[in-house]
């Protein structure tokens, strides 16, 4: 059995896009927390200009499956024009 995988992703929205980025991430979180192998998928407002997503996955395989999933594809599409 492999060790859990921990990740942090930092999101810096374009000017005026903070709340749209936060909403897109919150929508994704609602889907991702129920994915197999997801231990933690939590959003934090690090500053008024930066959001941090903290993830923990049971295994490399679970993370890889998540990375190819529809929730990540939808999130990437939603964020494509909103990030600095």
Each model region followed by its residue ranges:
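Basic/polar N-terminal segments that are highly enriched at the extreme N-terminus
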Residues: 1-2
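Hydrophobic aliphatic residue packing
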Residues: 5, 21, 29-32
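Short, surface-exposed ligand-recognition loops at beta-strand->loop->(often short) alpha-helix junctions
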Residues: 10-22
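Noncatalytic linker/hinge segments flanking ATPase motor cores
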Residues: 17, 47-54, 80-84
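An amphipathic, aromatic/His-enriched active-site/gating alpha helix that lines ligand/cofactor pockets
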Residues: 27, 31-39, 56-84
């Amino acid at each position: 059995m492999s060790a859990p995988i921990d990740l942090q992703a930092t999101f810096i929205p374009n000017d005026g896009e903070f709340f749209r980025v936060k909403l897109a991430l919150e929508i994704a979180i609602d889907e991702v927390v129920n994915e197999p192998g997801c231990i933690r998928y939590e959003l934090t407002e690090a500053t008024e200009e930066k959001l941090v997503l903290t993830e923990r996955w049971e295994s490399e395989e679970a993370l890889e499956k998540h990375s190819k999933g529809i929730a990540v594809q939808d999130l990437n599409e939603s964020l494509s024009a909103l990030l600095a």
